[in-house]
Structure formats: C-alpha cells, structure tokens
C-alpha cells in the first residue's frame, strides 16, 4: 500500500471555504490600497542569494530557504572544502538562489533595478507569499503571505497620515475594533540621551518593548543586566509609564526631552500625525505608546503597531518610516514609509469574531438538478440567464439519483435547488426548493431569478 502523502511542516492546504475567506481579506486590503493610489508589483518567488544574504542579520540568514543548483554542483568544490563540513560555505557553492524571506528586500532590489522607469514618490503594494526556515509552531509557519504597502522617495509626514487612514479603513471594513499604537524612533533616541545612556538605545528599547509581556520588574532587571545603572533606570520609569491623553503625553515629552534635539523632532513629527488623523475623523483608537519599539534596526521615524481590541492575539499590522532603503544595493538617499498587514492573523481574528460576510464566503447559490439529457437541455438556457444576472449557479453534470444530487447541494451549502421534470417543462416553469426552510414553489425563470437574488 502506497504511503499516505503529506506536506512539509510549517505549510498548509486551504479548503475552498478557507480560500473564500482569505480572498475576502486580500481583496478588501487590495481595494483600500487602490483607493489611496498604490500600485501593485510582483517579484519572483526566488531571488539571487547575493540579494538576500546579509540583509537580515546572522539569524535571518540562517532562516533563508536556499535552492540547490541543478547539474553537477560538486564541480569546482575541493575535497578540502567538503571535509571542512562548513555548511554556510558549502551552501554558497551549491546554491545561488533562495526563496524570498520578506517583501522589503525584493522591493528595494526592484526600485534599484527599475529606477529609470519609476515615477517618484513611488506608491507600491505587494500581496505575495514569503518563506522562512523557522521552527513551526502555533501561529508560526514556514510559508505565509505578507500584504505590504510602501511609499518611497518622499519625506512628507502626509504619507504617515495616509497609512493610519488606510489601517483604519481596512479594519473598519472588516468590522474589527483596533488600537493603532504610534511611537517615533527619534523620541526613543531622545529618551536614551536624557537618561545618559545614548549608546544603549537598542538595549533600552528592546527591554521596554517587552513591558506588556514581562512586566516592569522584569524590564528593570533586563536593563540592569545590560549594564544600565540604577540612576538611569530610575529616570526612565516615569517616562515609559507616562499616562494621559496623547496631547498630555506630548506636552510632558516636550519638557522631558527639552535638551534632546532628536527627541523634540520626534515629538514634533508625532504631534503632526496625531493631530492630523484626529482632524480627519479616524474612527479607530490611536494612541502614543512610548514602549513601542518594533523594527529598531531599520526604522528611523514613526513606528506603527495595530492590536485587535476584542481578541487576544499579537500584532495584526505594523510598519514605520525608514531611511536609505536602497543603500544596500548602492542607491543612496531613498527614504520611505510602509505598513504590512498580517493576513494569517487577520484570518484568525475574523474567524473568532465570526465577521465574514455571507456573500464573501458563499459559493454556488443555485443548483439545477439533472434528470437526463432532455431536462438538462431545458435547464441550460435558464442557467446561462441566471449567470448573466450575476447568480453563482451550476448544473449537476450527471443524471444521478436525486438523493445524491441533494446531498451534493447540502455538502456545498447551496441555498437553492431548481428541479425540472416533465410537468415543469410542459408548463415552462421550474420547482425551486429553499434548502434552508425546505419550502418548494413552482416558478417561472424570471420569478426564480427574483427569489434567488432577493
């Protein structure tokens, strides 16, 4: 007996119902991207390893899926190199390509390659899968989709304002209540400066970013373990625990960061974003959160993170401002800002809250039962007519037993079934059965259409 087939760990199959839900998510996000003037690009699933390596740090490089060269890949490799068992070095000999790890580095490569064809500022979006050789666990996969929108070639804070509006609109369409948290890398820099630990900004922000997860006491312990003196930790406490409205926090920061040029610039930028989105009537909760420190290695200005208010789950969207996106490919001076929507987590949130519209996940709306060639020939013109009216309809392809055809309709959750026999054909009508209520009625083709579309 043949072994039962399987799929690689960290990957998934999606059923027709699951795909209908996923496409609803992708289409909703895509529609909002279009509404704000973003244009779609796609990049290859595989990139040259020279494009990918060194862009994600040592740990990130280890998570790249590398593609083995075809042909005699041992050619040119010495016995000494083989015996060294240096996996990284040998991989560079065996593999010249890898699966993309994210959409950001391929986007940077795209901008550099096509800079003479692009009009700047360039507003682009991508909805494509990425791959990471991570250890699979709940909520973490080796293959998953990213939905990214970035605008490059502009320093204007209006771009940040638009991104907040886009986040608000996307989750408004989904019916999900969210909190949009905002911070600024310059504010974090200013905080590190005024407590006298400017060179420890990464250690400080990595620690305070964990405040919600591990609590203040453990954050302080981590700061101390990084060599930050107690005096500096004491100065930090009232800042990271700052409460009140966004306006009150900003006013306090103007005083606290008065001696930090970078810090005050961050406050100014945050104030503009917060005041503008408020004036524009953004419906979601927007909060200045000084503990937010995601992506510190590459974000240089505003930082965003989005949390669902009614479901316990991690970040479902995030992003920020970065400088010199294309610098790693020799094209300097390209600033940008972007966000990414976590499609897989949004999928889970909508499932938990049961927020998928019926029309988004329903498949066939009307099934024509097939009793034979004569009956099928009668049904086909009507089937064509209802499809032209926008009704998702099909005819059972075989003249099988009625029980089997009705079972098919039940399995696919088809709400209406059209039954045509000798009597219906003689009268120019159909029997329409409502599969939810069990009611049947004799109707004309026009009446059938009106009932199904109601």
Swiss-Prot record:
Catalyzed reactions per annotation: tRNA(His) + L-histidine + ATP = L-histidyl-tRNA(His) + AMP + diphosphate + H(+)
Molecular-function annotations in GO: ATP binding; histidine-tRNA ligase activity
Keywords: Aminoacyl-tRNA synthetase, ATP-binding, Cytoplasm, Ligase, Nucleotide-binding, Protein biosynthesis
Gene Ontology biological-process annotations: histidyl-tRNA aminoacylation
Annotated localization: Cytoplasm
Family: Belongs to the class-II aminoacyl-tRNA synthetase family.
NCBIfam families, per the entry: hisS
Subunit structure: Homodimer.
Protein name, as recorded: Histidine--tRNA ligase
Recorded name of the encoding gene: hisS
